[in-house]
Amino acid sequence: MIILSGQPVTNEQLASFQLEGQKRIILMQLQASNDTFRYRQASDLLFEVTLRSNIMNAARDLNKSGASFAIFQRSRANDAFWRVSEAGALELRYQVEPSRGIKDIFENGSQYAFECATAIVIVFYMGVLQTVGDEKFNRRLRSLTLYDWHYDTLSIYTERGNDFIYGDCLYFENPEFSYQQSQWRGENVIYLGEDQYYGHGLGILTAAEIIDKLNKRRRPGAVQSAYLLPQTTRMDVIYLRQMFGS
């Protein structure tokens, strides 16, 4: 449910936004959700809708970029823009504009390899970049480390629930993963709607297809199937609005 300026949003207000395509679907999903989404003003709501749409687009683009999957210890990147730490994090080089560094991953993906958690962070950053523009992005994010949630500056949080909305990050758990392939203990994905999920290293697949791939990477004698966890990982939109002054 959407609460706008302290009041439940009306159908007339929703219609006044005149959104189309996936943006309209996102708006209606927010309204139909059992979760409550509170906004001070209409521009905050439109910011979230646009951000989620851009996250979906970024996930599709990263899938086509040629970037490879790798465990953290084997991460690699375009050396002109990024330094790879011993832990496998991508650290933006001094005097490289953050927007340029993020865009290079999508433009020269074949030079990059990283874990699925890193891929989600990259998708989130690109979604924000496309939403706020280069100037604001570079002004507020003067240095970047791409690794997992612990290194983000976007106020990423995870909460329980299965009321999924386009652009959410979800997680497929593989409880009996092979110890020889511990990277397949699970898969972080971006929800693209209509049973489509982007998972780095797997591609854009249905839930059944992702579960099948994870099940093939279980340890011998495993009996428990992989499954989609009832949780969502999102960015704090109000925090982002304050951060970028949009």
UniProtKB/Swiss-Prot annotation:
GO terms under biological process: sporulation resulting in formation of a cellular spore
Keyword Signal attributed: no
Keywords: Acyltransferase, Sporulation, Transferase
Primary role: Probably plays a role in the assembly of the spore coat proteins by catalyzing epsilon-(gamma-glutamyl)lysine cross-links.
Pfam families: TGL
InterPro entries, alphabetized: Gln_gamma-glutamylTfrase_bac
GO molecular function per UniProt: protein-glutamine gamma-glutamyltransferase activity
Protein name per UniProt: Protein-glutamine gamma-glutamyltransferase
Listed transmembrane segments: none
EC number(s) recorded for this UniProt protein: 2.3.2.13
Top EC class for this record: transferase
Organism in which the protein naturally occurs: Bacillus pumilus (strain SAFR-032)
Keyword Acyltransferase attached: yes
Family of the protein in this entry: Belongs to the bacillus TGase family.
Reaction(s) the record says it catalyses: L-glutaminyl-[protein] + L-lysyl-[protein] = [protein]-L-lysyl-N(6)-5-L-glutamyl-[protein] + NH4(+)
